[in-house]
Amino acid sequence: MSKSYLMNTYGRFNVTFDKGEGTKLYDKDGNEYIDFVSGVAVNCLGHCNPSIVKAIEEQSSKLMHVSNYYWNENAMELTEILCKNSEFDKVFMCNSGTEAIEAGLKLARKYALLHGDENKKEIIYMDNSFHGRTMGALSVTGQPKYQESFKPLIGAVKSVKFNDLDDIKQKISSKTAAVIVEPIQGEGGIIPAKKEYLKLLRDLCDENNALLIFDEVQCGMGRVGSLFAYQKFEVVPDIVCIAKALGGGFPIGAMLAKESVASSFVPGDHGNTYGGNPLACAVAIAVLKELVDKKVVEINVNEKSKYLFDKLMTLKEKYKVINDVRGMGLLIGVEVACDVKKIINKCFESKLLLITAGKNVVRFLPPLNVSFEEIDKALGIFEESIK
């Protein structure tokens, strides 16, 4: 089958996968791989989870799409589950993380217009951040390599140093409409925000009548050991953006907000064609029931996180090539003092899938229901790659 028809926008590994089950992937020749990428934090319950497969089969034979001119029960049920398991009151449904970010940015601008003045438009973002590749999300992504070819981007945006208390104090002002931050910088190298930094952001936003937006696209939906990442940091934003694991492999995203903020939107302010469709929502409901009702997040993530961290710290003590082990839950970065791509490629050759984050960080993103045995097998391969 020809590869020539796909646009050249990704640097792909030389493998074509044909089947998946749990933490395993199989290529077209039947070779088995351990997947510690999880579709980049998407396949939170592994591949072809029975609950997800059942939801797709049942809903796809009943109703898949009706548009947002009409109500559908699955969208109502999903948004109720999300709100009842968070501090938020309203949900905007979409299809991806970058769409959720765009929705959050637009809501912040509309809120500022209604509750500030015409000059209150500024969005503050973090250096080294990543929020997506659409124009709005790209404009608040603090990595020039993604931005340079697409300037001019949207105006009235300003960057600050991540985790630097003094810098944000100096740059936030009455003109600031919102501050957007990842509780854990993912693409930037798995760098957690300091709790005191997020608390300061909350206080400064309140003082300046600005909104605080958390991008939990990668770190949310159970990945760090709580359903929402903000719950671990004990700082509640005004807006939170989620996607990836929400669909467990099926495209879906959402932007959640408090009623006082969400009410700024009126019909026509924002929308999309597929957001909240019955099929995607049925899948997300199935995912959340596994994560919450069956306590995958509460029990498995926290147990396996401690186990994986402890094992990686042992490797750090044993091998000088490991500079740091950091992260939270099952979002873990191992910073190395060598060419990180060589490690990734060695693991790939030994049938373990890992990816990079930042310049020299190996990113571990196993399914949230990963077993101790699968962790041991993956770490055995990883250790061989760093010897």
Curated annotation (Swiss-Prot):
SUPFAM superfamilies given in the database record: PLP-dependent transferases (SSF53383)
Q: Which PANTHER family match?
A: ACETYLORNITHINE AMINOTRANSFERASE, MITOCHONDRIAL, AMINOTRANSFERASE CLASS III
Q: Which gene encodes it?
A: argD
Gene Ontology cellular component terms for the protein in this record: cytoplasm
Q: How does it assemble?
A: Homodimer.
As stated in the Swiss-Prot or TrEMBL entry, residues carrying the post-translational modification N6-(pyridoxal phosphate)lysine are K244
State the protein's name.
Acetylornithine aminotransferase
TM spans, by residue? Answer: none
Short name of any one Pfam family annotated for the protein: Aminotran_3
- What is its pathway? Amino-acid biosynthesis; L-arginine biosynthesis; N(2)-acetyl-L-ornithine from L-glutamate: step 4/4
Do you know which InterPro entries this protein is assigned to? AcOrn/SuccOrn_fam (IPR004636), Aminotrans_3 (IPR005814), Aminotrans_3_PPA_site (IPR049704), Class-III_PLP-dep_AT (IPR050103), PyrdxlP-dep_Trfase (IPR015424), PyrdxlP-dep_Trfase_major (IPR015421), PyrdxlP-dep_Trfase_small (IPR015422)
NCBIfam families named among the record's database cross-references: argD, PRK01278.1
Which N-terminal residues, if any, form the signal peptide? none
* Annotated catalysed reactions: N(2)-acetyl-L-ornithine + 2-oxoglutarate = N-acetyl-L-glutamate 5-semialdehyde + L-glutamate
What's the EC number here? 2.6.1.11
Which cofactor names does the annotation list? Answer: pyridoxal 5'-phosphate
Miscellaneous remark of the record: May also have succinyldiaminopimelate aminotransferase activity, thus carrying out the corresponding step in lysine biosynthesis.
